[in-house]
Amino acid sequence: MKKYEIMYIIRPNMEEEAQKALVERFANVLTNNGAEIINTKEWGKRRLAYEINDLRDGFYMILNVNSNPEAVKEFDRLAKINEDIIRHIVVKEEE
């Protein structure tokens, strides 16, 4: 298993409960596919460097995970489809 850092930005206009459900759903996508979540950081609502889909702010989440590539690919696929995640990036950490 390799270490990855995943950062994603959620729409700022979501209700708090829906936001928590989204975070939990995407954490479950990783764990159900064999990943182990090491650390989760909520950066909270921050201003974006530039507008994305007419939004100026976003709710930032950062995950550090030990994972196989399949779990990360599934997360990436679902994050691209989901309209509540406005941006995401997956970085493989150096060993």
Curated annotation (Swiss-Prot):
Record-linked InterPro entries: Ribosomal_bS6, Ribosomal_bS6_CS, Ribosomal_bS6_sf, Ribosomal_S6_plastid/chlpt, Transl_elong_EF1B/ribsomal_bS6
UniProt organism field: Bacillus cytotoxicus (strain DSM 22905 / CIP 110041 / 391-98 / NVH 391-98)
Protein's name according to its UniProt entry: Small ribosomal subunit protein bS6
Pfam families documented for this protein: Ribosomal_S6
Cross-referenced PROSITE patterns: RIBOSOMAL_S6
Keywords: Ribonucleoprotein, Ribosomal protein, RNA-binding, rRNA-binding
Keyword Methyltransferase assigned: no
Primary role: Binds together with bS18 to 16S ribosomal RNA.
GO cellular component, one term: ribosome
Family: Belongs to the bacterial ribosomal protein bS6 family.
Organism superkingdom: Bacteria
Swiss-Prot/TrEMBL GO biological process terms: translation
SUPFAM superfamilies the UniProt entry points to: Ribosomal protein S6
Gene: rpsF
Annotated GO MF terms: small ribosomal subunit rRNA binding; structural constituent of ribosome
